[in-house]
Regions:
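Short, basic, glycine/proline-bearing loop/turn elements
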Residues: 23-28, 66-67, 98-104
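Helical hairpin unit composed of two closely spaced alpha helices linked by a short loop
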Residues: 50-94
Length: 175
């Protein structure tokens, strides 16, 4: 909270920075339409053999095609991402916004904003949310990682601790 790191914390930051620096990460903050993302992903697959594509977040994307509604546009985007994943043989993680009413309760698949196609096209859907809504500004709190859709297996939930100071999920020890 103070912005001052201990010597141990600074050492961890330095070590993490070195690890990240050596990773083959490619960050594109300019591409906003799905057609350009397809081109960019194919180039990266051919040139760098990428093994994962992450979209932050799906509802920010646009299509160059003229469609009748935003729902149709998001459907085209998710379908394109699904086909791209199959073509490039890599997982694609698409972060999504939820409808506003989902913020107060346990989210469900129909809370995915702007399209039912997101839940239909996704192989897996995972929600992360607070176990209890409270007014306390806790630094560490329990959160639920909720796998609500898994095309190849069962759904499940797990409770973990989340440390806001360092954005870290911590497994709870089972006794």
């Amino acid at each position: 909270r103070t912005g001052i790191l201990t010597e141990e914390e600074m050492q961890k930051v330095t070590e993490a920075t070195a690890i990240i620096y050596d990773l083959p990460l490619f960050i594109n903050t300019k591409t906003r339409n799905i057609q350009d993302i397809e081109i960019y992903a194919r180039k990266l697959k051919n040139k760098e053999n990428i093994g994962l594509l992450i979209i932050d977040y799906i509802q920010l994307l646009k299509s160059q095609n003229k469609l009748n509604s935003r729902e149709q546009e998001v459907s085209e985007i998710t379908r394109t991402l699904k086909l791209l994943s199959l073509e490039l043989k890599i997982p694609i993680i698409g972060l999504c916004q939820l409808n506003r009413n989902a913020a107060r309760t346990r989210p469900i698949l129909s809370d995915l904003r702007e399209s039912g196609a997101i839940e239909q096209d996704a192989d897996n859907v995972i929600f992360i949310y607070k176990k209890e809504e409270n007014e306390d500004q806790k630094v560490i709190e329990d959160v639920i990682i909720d796998l609500q859709k898994q095309r190849a297996g069962p759904t499940t939930q797990v409770t973990v601790r989340f440390d806001k100071r360092i954005n870290e999920f911590i497994n709870l020890v089972r006794r």
